[in-house]
């Protein structure tokens, strides 16, 4: 039964029991600042359980997207190395909001598992909270599970109610006992039942947890029965799929086999190995392929839900996951962007269940590709530093990676700390995290000391307000009312001082309404002050932030205040076009579009708005056309101050939740009319040209566009044109023929790759025939240790398979050398694996050539860095195998 069918059957079963099927919520928690990402099925129902929200249903069932990476729940470092850790997983759940309780929850679970999924009853074990006699009796007396397979778990975490079988939302609030269902994978796997000393083994695996919200815990820790108990359950789709598909590891289920094959194709693995991986168990596959199969899900779904790679918060977690994937692809041989190529395969597997993934396919691939290109520009140099440090450590016998080096990798080459730690883990060394943290703290302190002086609006000022003249003039005379240095009022500022100047009159616009503050110059009789930013100290008091360039300034002096006209004009273009763009977005996408935030400065406009789906290329073009038509119309801009009621009657657009005074400024520009206190162009034609350069998501239901105008728009368009012309010149075609020519080249490349694979296979077969004659008899079996010139690892593997078939009973070591590195494959036929293990054999050879490796008893792989020692290492194989036989 495939994963998609299991998901569908789960939802259909509970729908037949009166449950409302509810779509998965976004991975970005809605209005819950306590969560970095959605990590459980109940997250979207939290307010329902707390009584803050009412739904038209009392029973629900979901298949919820979840991510555990970053924050309290972080499985990132284990992904790829264990059977069941994931960054992304699907949680199947059924929920009762004051409707049914323990009896129905337990019987529903048992019916689904044993009658719908047909699991053997004797394979299922159950745990209950030690004091939950009700659940124990339902399991043993009503369901009929033998008492020896129903285990009571007490307070096993050092405090009252601190138990694996007692769930609490927090220190106070809803809580209650839970019952967990385990599947016994069989005695061939080590481990004991839950509660036993061997419970950490992998034989008994939890597949379903049913939480019974029965109590409300007060601040004194007293449990009060809830008037309407509820049920919250969760069953990992990956785990139940492994059980139903008869495999032990999650990475062996159909979904991951497909994605592992996709990863192999993306990094250029030979197609023969891809097919073998698809058709066999994946527990022998390199952890790196598992990392890629896992991470493509987390990254794609996060991007589809509006997260974009960045340097903080959710964006930085996403960047860490992407870069970890890139590093593992690099380890597998990828030297250019590859990860984004897996997106179509993921959409084929999961797009039907999650339409938002299918709708955002192009955007997801583009974001991944851009992030890959950025990191591939630095990864090679970064890896050289890593390898150099590891080599020095090996020489010195050191097992701790230098924290300052780790910080250099982070700061200069974009290596997140956990990526460096991941590499070190493979070499069995650790990173000095304390030294890394210290280096990070030093950099932050230096940045604070050297950075631009920018103060929050908390200066101690109790004087007259500033009169603003900047709507109609860019120069004005003013007197200095106050000066500040290091946040303290002073009488004067001298050359080199960073400070804040308060004037009685100014043409400088102070940052407000998303528009950046003006910059420019204050010129007095005794000195010149460079204004780098203008911020409001109080509602009507403007602070001019900057540095004294020459001479000095003193309180009471007069100055000539001059705004940087070019910067102001660019900002005005970007602000005015934001109004036109807002109107156009509502025309194209619908009236639900509302402003959620904006930033307007001389370089660009950034506009956040309410919308649930990525904009299509056609929608972006349509918005651009509408705005540029308004620009060409060259309509005059009009601003009027009026009563708030009059502004509302005029149809002026207002921001939801914004507080306005009794009088407001209404700006009419083209067909747009909004409340706005910013600075704008005189006519729409002054904007020149408008071009959207970025569209993406920033939160659940919030999209972001970035756009440029005027000269910046012209430069952007010319740069895009230059790139196309550059490609067309390389291809020797006209620009409008580039796409067709590239498609033809790709077809040729694919044909050549197939031909190369065919020739390598033919070469392997030919070499295999020649090598058979070189095998010698050892203890009644054949032994072969040989070098294949020019063979890559897939060719070594293919040759190994052919040799094992021909030699029947044999131990074989094949080697090749390329770029100063040794590749080794060891193979042992099934009849000899009881005495000779391929993993031990390949390690014996690898250790002599400066490497190590491992694998299955019948097939193993290794590498080395000392090819000059290879002949002696291969010559020693016969004695080693003879001793084993």
From Swiss-Prot:
Amino-acid positions noted as binding Zn(2+) in the UniProt annotation, renumbered to this chain: 575, 579, 676, 680
GO molecular function, one term: tRNA binding
Pfam families for the chain: DHHA1 (PF02272), tRNA-synt_2c (PF01411), tRNA_SAD (PF07973)
Cofactor(s), names only, from the UniProt record: Zn(2+)
UniProt xrefs under PROSITE patterns: AA_TRNA_LIGASE_II_ALA
Domain of life: Bacteria
Transmembrane feature ranges: none
Enzyme Commission number, as recorded: 6.1.1.7
Function: Catalyzes the attachment of alanine to tRNA(Ala) in a two-step reaction: alanine is first activated by ATP to form Ala-AMP and then transferred to the acceptor end of tRNA(Ala). Also edits incorrectly charged Ser-tRNA(Ala) and Gly-tRNA(Ala) via its editing domain.
Protein name according to UniProt: Alanine--tRNA ligase
Protein species of origin: Azoarcus sp. (strain BH72)
């Amino acid at each position: 039964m495939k994963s998609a069918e299991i998901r569908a059957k789960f939802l259909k079963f509970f729908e037949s029991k009166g449950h409302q099927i509810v779509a998965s919520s976004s991975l970005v928690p809605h209005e819950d600042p306590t969560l970095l990402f959605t990590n459980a099925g109940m997250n979207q129902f939290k307010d329902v359980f707390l009584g803050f929200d009412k739904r038209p249903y009392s029973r629900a069932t979901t298949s919820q997207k979840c991510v555990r990476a970053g924050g309290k729940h972080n499985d990132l470092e284990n992904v790829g190395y264990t059977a069941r850790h994931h960054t992304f997983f699907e949680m199947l759940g059924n929920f009762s909001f004051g409707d049914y309780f323990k009896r129905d929850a337990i019987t529903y679970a048992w019916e689904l598992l044993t009658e719908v999924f047909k699991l053997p009853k004797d394979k299922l074990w159950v745990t209950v909270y030690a004091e939950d006699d009700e659940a124990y009796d339902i399991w043993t007396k009503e369901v009929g599970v033998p008492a020896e397979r129903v285990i009571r778990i007490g307070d096993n975490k050092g405090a009252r109610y601190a138990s694996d079988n007692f769930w609490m939302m927090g220190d106070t609030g809803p809580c209650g006992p839970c019952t967990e269902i385990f599947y016994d994978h069989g005695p061939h796997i080590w481990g004991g039942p839950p509660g036993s000393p061997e419970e950490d083994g992998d034989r008994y695996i939890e597949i379903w947890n049913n939480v019974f919200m029965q109590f409300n815990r007060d601040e004194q820790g007293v449990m009060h029965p809830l008037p309407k108990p509820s049920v919250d359950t969760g069953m990992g789709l990956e785990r139940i799929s492994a059980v139903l598909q008869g495999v032990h590891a999650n990475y062996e289920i159909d979904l991951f086999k497909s994605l592992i094959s996709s990863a192999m194709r993306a990094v250029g693995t030979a197609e023969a190995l891809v097919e073998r991986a698809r058709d066999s168990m994946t527990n022998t596959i390199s952890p790196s392929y598992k990392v890629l199969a896992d991470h493509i899900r987390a990254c794609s779904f996060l991007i589809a839900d509006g997260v974009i790679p960045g340097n903080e918060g959710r964006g930085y977690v996403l960047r860490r996951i992407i870069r970890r994937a890139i590093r593992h692809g690099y380890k597998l041989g990828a030297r250019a962007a590859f990860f984004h190529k897996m997106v179509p395969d993921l959409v084929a597997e999961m797009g039907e269940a999650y339409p938002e993934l299918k709708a955002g396919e192009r955007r997801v691939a583009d974001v991944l590709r851009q992030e890959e290109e950025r990191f591939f520009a630095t990864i090679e140099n970064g890896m050289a530093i890593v390898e150099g440090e590891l080599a020095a450590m090996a020489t010195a016998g050191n097992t701790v990676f230098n924290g300052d080096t780790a910080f250099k990798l982070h700061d200069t080459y974009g290596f997140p700390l956990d990526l460096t730690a991941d590499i070190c883990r493979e070499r069995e060394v650790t990173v000095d995290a304390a030294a890394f943290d210290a280096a990070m703290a030093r950099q932050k302190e230096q940045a604070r000391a050297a950075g631009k002086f920018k103060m929050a609006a908390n200066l101690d000022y109790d004087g007259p307000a500033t009169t603003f003249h900047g709507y109609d003039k860019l120069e004005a005379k003013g007197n200095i009312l106050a000066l500040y240095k290091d946040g303290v009022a002073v009488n004067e500022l001298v050359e080199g001082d960073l400070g804040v100047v308060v004037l009685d009159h100014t043409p400088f616009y102070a940052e407000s309404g998303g528009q950046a503050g003006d910059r420019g110059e204050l010129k007095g009789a005794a000195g010149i002050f460079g204004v780098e930013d203008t911020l409001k100290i109080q509602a009507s008091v403007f602070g001019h932030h900057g540095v004294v360039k020459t001479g000095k300034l003193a309180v009471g002096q007069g100055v000539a205040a001059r705004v940087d006209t070019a910067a102001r004009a660019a900002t005005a273009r970007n602000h005015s076009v934001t109004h036109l763009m807002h109107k156009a977005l509502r025309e194209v996408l619908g009236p639900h579009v509302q402003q959620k935030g904006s930033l307007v400065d001389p370089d660009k406009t950034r506009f956040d708005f309410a919308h649930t789906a990525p904009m299509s290329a056609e929608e972006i073009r349509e918005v651009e056309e509408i705005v540029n038509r308004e620009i060409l119309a060259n309509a005059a801009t009009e601003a009027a101050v009026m009563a708030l009621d009059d502004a509302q009657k005029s149809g002026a657009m207002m921001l939801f939740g914004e507080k306005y005074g009794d009088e407001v400024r209404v700006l009419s520009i083209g067909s747009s009319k909004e409340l706005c206190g910013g600075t704008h162009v005189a006519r729409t034609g002054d904007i020149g040209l408008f071009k959207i350069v970025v569209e993406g998501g920033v939160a659940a239901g919030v999209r972001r566009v970035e756009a440029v105008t005027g000269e910046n728009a012209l430069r952007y368009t010319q740069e895009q044109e230059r790139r196309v012309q550059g490609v067309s010149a390389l291809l020797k075609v006209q620009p409008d023929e580039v796409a067709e020519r590239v498609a033809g080249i790709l077809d040729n490349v694919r044909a050549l790759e197939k031909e190369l694979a065919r020739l390598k296979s033919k070469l392997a077969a030919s070499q295999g025939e020649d090598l058979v004659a070189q095998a010698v008899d050892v203890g009644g079996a054949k032994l072969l240790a040989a070098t294949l010139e020019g063979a890559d690892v897939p060719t070594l593997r293919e040759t190994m398979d052919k040799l094992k078939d021909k030699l029947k009973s044999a131990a074989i070591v094949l080697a090749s050398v390329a770029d100063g590195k040794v590749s080794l494959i060891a193979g042992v036929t099934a009849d000899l694996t009881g005495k000779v293990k391929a993993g031990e054999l390949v390690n014996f050879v690898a250790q002599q050539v400066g490497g190590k490796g491992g694998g299955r008893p019948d097939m193993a792989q290794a590498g080395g860095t000392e090819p000059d020692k290879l002949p002696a290492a291969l010559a020693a194989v016969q004695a080693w195998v003879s001793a084993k036989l």
